[in-house]
Amino acid sequence: ALPIFYPLPALLVSCGSTEEEYNIITVAWAGTICTNPAMCYISVRPERHSYPILKRNMEFVINLTTKSMAFATDWCGVRSGKDYNKFEEMKLTPGKAKIVSAPIIEESPLCIECRVKEIISLGSHDMFIADVVNVKADDKYLNAETGKFELSEANPLVYVHGGYFELGPKIGKFGWSVEKNRSQTKEKS
C-alpha cells in the first residue's frame, strides 16, 4: 500500500557520534507529534545503513532541505553510507550541534536536534520518537519582529509520489476562515 497523506517533508537526517560514523539519510516519513514537550518522529527501515547508527546513539538531527539542496536530498536517499561519505560527496558541511553528538548540516536553514525517547517497530519501518532538545535556525529566515522562522522564505522541499516540489504561496493563516473580515485578513496574511 502506498501512503495517502501528501505532501511529505523531504528531510536530511544526520546521525553518528564521530566523524568516521557520520551519515545522512533522506527521510520523508517524519513530523511533529507533540508541542509541549516538543517531540517529533522519523520512520526508518531497519535494513538501512543509518538504522544501527540511530539505534546505537539514540540521537539525530532533522535538517530542513531547500530547493538548492534538492540534488543532495535525492542523492542521499538513493546512495548508502556503507559505500559513500555523503557529506564529502555532496559537499555538505557537518557542523557541531549544541546538545547532541550527531552533526548538523550547515547548509540547512533549520536544524532540529533530537534525542530518541522510544523506538516502535511498526512493520516495514521503525518509528523513532524523539524529544526536540535544540533548534538552530539561520538568522536570515527569522522574522525581525516576531523572531519566528519564516518557512516560506526558506523554499523548503516536499515529496509527493516520487517527486520533489517546492511549496507555493501562502493562501491563508490558521483561523482566518472565522475572522469577521476574511477577505482583508487573507490578503494581509
PLM feature segments, named:
Residues 1-189:
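Basic, polyanion-binding surface patches
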